[in-house]
A protein has these predicted regions:
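A short, aliphatic-rich alpha-helical micro-motif
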Residues: 156-158, 203-204, 239
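Conserved beta-alpha-beta core of the PfkB/ribokinase-like small-molecule kinase fold
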Residues: 162-232, 252-254
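Gly/Ala-rich phosphate-binding loop of Rossmann-like dinucleotide-binding domains
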Residues: 78, 182, 291
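Conserved N-terminal subdomain of the carbohydrate kinase-like
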Residues: 53-57, 64, 79-161, 327-328
Length: 328
C-alpha cells in the first residue's frame, strides 16, 4: 500500500491526475507508437565488480531515476522522433507522481497511465566497471495490470500503427494486448524481457519479436552464441508462426531475419560504460524507424546507432539519446 510513501499523491484528485497526464506531444512521425509496459524507479549503484551469492561488496556512485523496460522504450521512441502513447500503472506515491510528471515532460501521450493501490515499481541495479549489470525488480503496480485494464484501452490500441510490448507486466495482459493489436491490423512487436516461458498463443499475434541471446535460448532451447546458433534458434521461433525475428547480440550487433533472409547488422565500436538501457533504446528506435516507413534493415541500423550512444553514458533513461544525436 502507499502509506509508506508521500501522502500528497496518495490523495490525488481526478483534476490533479488529469493535469499530470495532459500530453504535450512533440514528434516527427504522425504514425502512433503505442507502448504498454512497466514503469519503475531505478536505484543504481556502481561497483568495481558484481557480488557473488552471499557476498557484500562496497559500491561507489549511487543514482535514482525513472526506468522500467516499458518506460525506457517509450522514452526512447519519443526522444528519437516517435509519436508515442504510453500505457502503464503506477502507485499513489511519490514515485508514481514523479513518473507521470517525467513522462509528460518527455512529450508523450500519458492519458493511458493508470493508478494502483500497490506501490510503484522499483528496480535495484548494480553495474560494474565493465558495464555489465544485474537487476532485481519489485513489480508493485506493474503486476496490477489486468486483462480488463487492457480491454479498457482497446480503442487506443486499435488506433495505433505499432504496438510495442515487453514482459515486466503480467503475461496475460501482454497476450490480450497483442491479440487486440493483431486483430486490428496493428504491427505488434514483442521484446520478450525479462525472459520467461511464453504461452504458445502469443506467437501468432506477433509481427516481430526481438529477443537477446539469453531470451531466445530460453524460448527455443537452442543456444545463440554465434550467427549459426542464432539461425537455428530463429528457425525454431519461426515455426511458431512469428513473421520476423531480430536477435540482439550485445556488442557484436544483431541478426535480422525477414522474409526468410538473414542480415547481420554490426554494432558500432564504442567505449561502453553501462548497458542497462541499450536493448530498450534499440527497441524504441527500431519502432520509430519503422513508423517512418524505413524497411526493417534500415530500422535495425538506426536502432543500432541509437543504442551505441546509450551504452556510452551511465543510467537508464539518462543515457537514452535524442534524434539530433544520431549519426548513421
Amino acid at each position: 500500500m502507499c502509506t509508506n510513501y508521500a501522502q500528497s499523491f496518495a490523495q490525488l484528485t481526478t483534476l490533479d491526475y488529469n493535469i499530470l497526464t495532459t500530453n504535450n506531444l512533440i514528434n516527427m512521425s504522425e504514425k502512433k507508437i503505442m507502448v504498454i509496459g512497466s514503469s519503475n524507479t531505478d536505484m543504481t549503484v556502481v561497483a568495481d565488480r558484481l557480488p557473488v551469492p552471499g557476498e557484500t561488496v562496497l559500491g561507489g556512485k549511487f543514482a535514482m531515476g525513472p526506468g522500467g523496460k516499458g518506460a525506457n522504450q517509450a522514452v526512447a521512441a519519443q526522444r528519437l522522433g516517435g509519436n508515442v502513447s504510453f500505457i502503464c500503472k503506477v502507485g499513489k506515491d511519490i514515485f508514481g507522481e514523479n513518473a507521470i510528471r517525467h513522462y509528460n515532460n518527455e512529450g508523450m501521450d500519458t492519458t493511458g497511465i493508470m493508478l494502483s493501490e500497490q506501490p510503484s515499481g522499483v528496480a535495484l541495479i548494480s553495474v560494474d566497471t565493465h558495464a555489465e549489470n544485474c537487476i532485481v525488480v519489485a513489480s508493485g503496480a506493474n503486476g496490477d495490470i489486468t486483462e480488463a485494464d487492457i480491454e479498457s484501452h482497446r480503442k487506443e490500441i486499435e488506433a495505433a500503427s505499432i504496438l510495442l510490448l515487453q514482459l515486466e507486466i503480467p503475461v496475460e495482459a501482454v497476450v490480450r494486448a497483442a491479440k487486440i493489436g493483431h486483430e486490428a491490423g496493428v504491427y505488434v512487436v514483442l521484446n520478450p524481457a525479462p525472459a520467461c516461458d511464453l504461452p504458445e498463443e502469443i506467437y501468432q499475434y506477433l509481427s516481430l519479436i526481438i529477443p537477446n541471446q539469453t531470451e531466445i535460448a530460453l524460448m527455443t532451447g537452442i543456444e545463440a552464441r554465434d550467427e549459426e546458433g542464432a539461425a537455428k534458434a530463429v528457425e525454431a521461433l519461426r515455426g511458431k508462426r512469428v513473421q520476423d525475428v531480430i536477435v540482439t547480440m550485445g556488442s557484436k550487433g544483431s541478426m535480422v531475419y525477414h522474409q526468410g533472409q538473414a542480415t547481420f547488422v554490426p554494432s558500432k565500436k564504442v567505449n561502453a560504460v553501462d548497458t542497462t538501457a541499450a536493448g530498450d533504446t534499440y527497441c524504441g528506435g527500431l519502432c520509430v524507424a519503422l513508423s517512418e516507413g524505413k524497411d526493417i534493415i534500415e530500422a535495425a541500423r538506426f536502432a543500432t546507432a541509437a543504442s551505441a550512444l546509450t551504452v556510452q553514458k551511465r543510467g537508464a533513461q539518462d543515457s537514452i539519446p535524442y534524434r539530433k544525436d544520431i549519426i548513421l
